[in-house]
Amino acid sequence: MEGKRMGYKEQYNFWLEDSYFDEAVKKELQEIGGDEKEIEDRFYKDLAFGTGGLRGVIGAGTNRMNIYTVRKATQGLANYIKKQGGEAKGVAIAYDSRRKSPEFADEAALCLAANGIKAYVFESLRPTPELSFALRELGCISGIVITASHNPPEYNGYKCYWEDGAQVTAPKDKEIITEVNNVTDYHTVKTMDKTEAMNAGLYQVIGKEIDDKYMEELKKQIIHPEIIKEVAKDMKIVYSPFNGTGNLPVRRILREIGFENVYVVPEQEMPDPDFTTLD
């Protein structure tokens, strides 16, 4: 698969026949075997890794979000990190409530681990700002958030952050894009068993300790705490996390700084990958 990119039909057959790809992917591809337009759309190009990372429809194919395109992007990031001499610092990983987000986070972590780069993975979904805090708190070289932000439910994405806690900017963005695009052979993409990675100290679950430190840091950012003390007891707040990641952390920080009357929209309280209340 190295060298000039195959045509879409060759790519389709490669994914269908090569032992590298799992049976679930092959079954999905077999089901579209008679749909030439769908095959072309899934394979006519590689899912673009841009300045914001990856974003695309979930499914099998080179132009889709799946474990293989996530691994490929992560291999490119790992190659860049190693060239920068940052592999000892590790990478923090968070994910949202979308379909496949936990799986994609794990695949990214295990690719990093296979490259000798420690992954710090949140135990459950977390908001993007906490990822920015975590990677700085842990002294990581980079961070990854599995999210597609405002896109429809059938989408997911992969955002890359650097050691300052912000999304990658010039010139690093283009340098990382180059490394990702240089990964042309899926067989060169590394991965490893999760238990093996954990035993080797290359996969660490993070959670409450980071949450607590994040909350304390948020409290330091309050500009007028005296005003909050005056109004918090009587003020009523209506909040909606829109079925995403904000429910627990937002309610926690509001409670801890004194707001007692916080009402969450019940239909949009729990994580929902289908975002069924939103048009």
Positions of PLM-derived features:
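Short, Lys/Arg-enriched N-terminal segments with co-localized hydrophobic residues
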Residues: M1-R5
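An N-terminal, well-structured beta->alpha segment
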Residues: E10-A108, A197-D234, T245
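Short, glycine-/Ser/Thr-/acidic-enriched flexible segments
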Residues: F21, L54-G56, G61-N63, R98, ...
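Gly/Ser/Thr-enriched, mixed-charge loops and adjacent short helices
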Residues: E38-F43, L47, N156-D279
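Gly/Ala-rich phosphate-binding loop of Rossmann-like dinucleotide-binding domains
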Residues: K82, A109, A113, R255
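Alpha-helix termination/capping residues and helix-transition junctions
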Residues: G85, E137-L138, E256
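N-terminal small/polar loop signature for handling phosphorylated ligands or for N-terminal nucleophile
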Residues: A92, S97-Y155, E260-D279
